[in-house]
């Protein structure tokens, strides 16, 4: 990967991780990115736009505030594979950094494009409001140059397993996401040669949702967490020499949503209740908009035909 004009800012980027925990946390998927969504339930046939904006404030003094915008397009095709509704998706996350340096040190805001996510959800309707889904996707990190975070030195492969209960206005969803990498990854160019190979730990993320709709309103609780999976043997020693420490966090919060008709809005606030590194707790605020761009026309009702006609 070519660092290009961002090469000089690689040190600043390396200090900001998507999971907002200890340095070199390895999750490319944003923790909490999918809370509030019934990911396990098949979508009605159509095309949907979902935009999630997250602002994260860390308790560490002089730490950089981060904001993440995740726009997603999902096409619920109506086609089946092994009984599952096929739902291709495309996303282009962007991370923004807002430094809070001590007096005398200039602050310089920046943004980083995360690798484009392409993949598909396969969702099964089990009946009685129950649904399960499997996500297979990849963040094409090598296609987006100019970034200095170790997570982006290789493609991120992503799979997800979700279950949802959506009857009677409920959204009870558990979603487990696994990130794994082309490890060791590396950046190209002179800076990449100087840094050398980067040894990346896989990551697990859990998103939990429990909400209820009351008319057009939706109210409930959300929780989410992320942890690195252990690196083995030599890879752990090599990663530790590069500054890697295991990272993880778990946050709990609330959700309120409203159906405006053409689109639905959700607001969420969550706070870390457990972190691997004490003093790195964060508070997250979420804004999400969900809009159907196209809905398949409903089949016309068939009028009954008399068995006998009288002439």
Show the residue positions of the predicted features.
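Sec/Tat signal peptide C-region and signal peptidase I cleavage site
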Residues: 19-25
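Outer membrane beta-barrel transmembrane domains
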Residues: 29, 33, 54, 186, ...
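Hydrophobic, lipid-facing positions within transmembrane beta-strands of outer-membrane proteins
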Residues: 33-35, 47-49, 67-73, 114-119, ...
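Short loop/turn motifs that connect adjacent beta-strands in outer-membrane beta-barrel proteins
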Residues: 38-46, 77-87, 125-133, 166-170, ...
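Transmembrane beta-barrel domains of outer membrane proteins
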Residues: 40, 74-78, 121-123, 160-166, ...
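Transmembrane beta-strands of outer-membrane beta-barrel proteins
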Residues: 47-49, 84-90, 132-136, 165, ...
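Outer-membrane beta-barrel pore domains and translocons
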Residues: 54-56, 91-95, 137-141, 177-181, ...
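Outer-membrane pore/translocation modules
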Residues: 94-199, 243-246, 259, 311
């Amino acid at each position: 990967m070519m660092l290009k004009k961002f090469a000089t800012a690689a040190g600043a980027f390396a200090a900001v991780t998507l999971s907002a925990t200890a340095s070199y946390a390895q999750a490319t998927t944003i923790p909490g990115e999918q809370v509030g969504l019934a990911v396990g339930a098949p979508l009605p046939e159509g095309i949907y736009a979902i935009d999630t904006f997250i602002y994260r404030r860390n308790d560490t003094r002089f730490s950089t505030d981060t904001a993440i915008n995740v726009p997603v397009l999902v096409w619920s095709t109506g086609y089946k594979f092994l009984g599952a509704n096929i739902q291709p998706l495309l996303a282009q996350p962007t991370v923004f950094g807002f430094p809070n340096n001590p007096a005398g040190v200039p602050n310089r805001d920046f943004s980083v494009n995360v690798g484009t996510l392409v993949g598909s959800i396969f969702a099964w309707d089990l009946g009685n409001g129950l649904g399960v889904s499997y996500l297979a996707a990849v963040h094409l990190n090598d296609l987006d140059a100019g970034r200095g975070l170790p997570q982006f030195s290789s493609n991120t492969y992503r799979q997800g397993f979700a279950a949802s209960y959506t009857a009677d206005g409920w959204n009870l969803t558990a979603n487990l996401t696994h990130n794994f990498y082309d490890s060791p990854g590396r950046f190209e160019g002179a800076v990449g040669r100087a840094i050398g190979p980067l040894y990346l730990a896989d990551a697990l993320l859990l998103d939990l949702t429990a909400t209820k709709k009351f008319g057009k309103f939706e109210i409930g609780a959300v929780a989410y967490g992320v942890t690195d999976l252990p690196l083995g043997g030599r890879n752990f020693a090599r990663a530790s020499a590069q500054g890697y420490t295991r990272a993880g966090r778990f946050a709990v919060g609330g959700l309120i949503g409203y159906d405006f008709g053409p689109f639905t809005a959700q607001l969420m606030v969550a706070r870390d209740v457990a972190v691997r590194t004490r003093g790195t707790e964060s508070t997250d605020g979420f804004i999400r908009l969900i809009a159907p761009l196209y809905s398949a026309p409903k089949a016309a009702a068939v009028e009954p035909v008399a068995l006998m006609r009288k002439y």
